Each structure stands twice: as structure tokens, then as C-alpha cells.
From Swiss-Prot:
Compositionally biased region (Polar residues): 104-114
InterPro entries in the record: Gas-vesicle_GvpA-like, GvpA, GvpA-like_CS
Annotated Basic and acidic residues bias: 80-91
Keyword Membrane attributed: no
Lineage top rank: taxon: Archaea
Protein name: Gas vesicle protein J
Chain segments carrying region Disordered: 63-114
Protein encoded by which gene: gvpJ
The protein's role, per its UniProt record: A minor component of the gas vesicle, proteins GvpF to GvpM might be involved in nucleating gas vesicle formation. Gas vesicles are hollow, gas filled proteinaceous nanostructures found in some microorganisms. They allow positioning of halobacteria at the optimal depth for growth in the poorly aerated, shallow brine pools of their habitat. Expression of a 9.5 kb mc-vac DNA fragment containing 2 divergently transcribed regions (gvpD-gvpE-gvpF-gvpG-gvpH-gvpI-gvpJ-gvpK-gvpL-gvpM and gvpA-gvpC-gvpN-gvpO) allows H.volcanii to produce gas vesicles.
Protein's cellular compartments: Gas vesicle
Native organism: Haloferax mediterranei (strain ATCC 33500 / DSM 1411 / JCM 8866 / NBRC 14739 / NCIMB 2177 / R-4)
Keywords, comma-separated and alphabetical: Gas vesicle
């Protein structure tokens, strides 16, 4: 008997992408390269991947030039609701993220000593 071979179906990839866009993913990374006390390179990465609908529900900022009417239509919210999303603080928006995603998005940049 031969060993079973793993198979991949296109449905799995499509389901994974649908879940990713439906739930959204937030990436928060701080990278520092130092020698001794001298920091040579510092990178702060903040990225969010989500569908327009999910991003609009959480009040994430959209790039300039985005057709906001289409975003509001996709999210099923009125223009008044989208304005109220913009007025909430970032911490209020992050508190609404499901699971630990809201807790993991914070400003963790190292503080300079005086």
C-alpha cells in the first residue's frame, strides 16, 4: 500500500480568503537593529487587511481617492454613521476588534531615556 498524499482543493483557499477578509487581520511590528546603545535601524509596521465592509465597520482609515459612497454601500451604513465612526478615538475603535486583535494593536515603540 502506498502512503496517502496530501491534497489541496481550490475551495479551501477561497474559504480562507473569505474568512480573512470577513474577520480582518491586524499586523503590528516594531523592529530595531542596535549595536551597543546606538540604534542603527528602526521600523514600525502597522497594517490591516480586511474587506471594505469589515474595515468600514471598525472605522479604519481608507487611502485618499477611495470612493467612500461605495464603501458605505458595501458596509450597509449611512453617511451619518460613517461620520460618527470617524469621530471615535482610536482606542475606542480597537476595543471593538474581536478576540485579542484589539489588545495587540497598541503603540509599543520604545521610549527614549532622558
Amino acid at each position: 500500500m502506498s502512503a496517502p498524499k496530501p491534497t489541496r482543493s481550490q475551495g479551501d483557499l477561497a474559504e480562507m480568503l473569505e474568512m480573512l477578509l470577513d474577520k480582518g487581520v491586524v499586523i503590528n511590528a516594531d523592529i530595531a537593529v542596535s549595536i551597543g546603545d546606538t540604534e542603527l535601524l528602526g521600523i514600525e509596521l502597522r497594517a490591516a487587511v480586511a474587506s471594505f465592509e469589515t474595515a468600514a465597520q471598525y472605522g479604519l482609515e481608507f487611502p485618499t481617492g477611495t470612493d467612500m459612497e461605495r464603501v458605505e454601500e458595501a458596509a450597509g451604513i449611512s453617511p451619518d454613521e460613517s461620520r460618527s465612526l470617524d469621530t471615535r478615538s482610536e482606542s475606542e475603535q480597537m476595543d471593538e476588534l474581536p478576540g485579542e486583535a484589539g489588545a495587540s494593536v497598541s503603540n509599543t515603540a520604545p521610549q527614549e531615556e532622558e
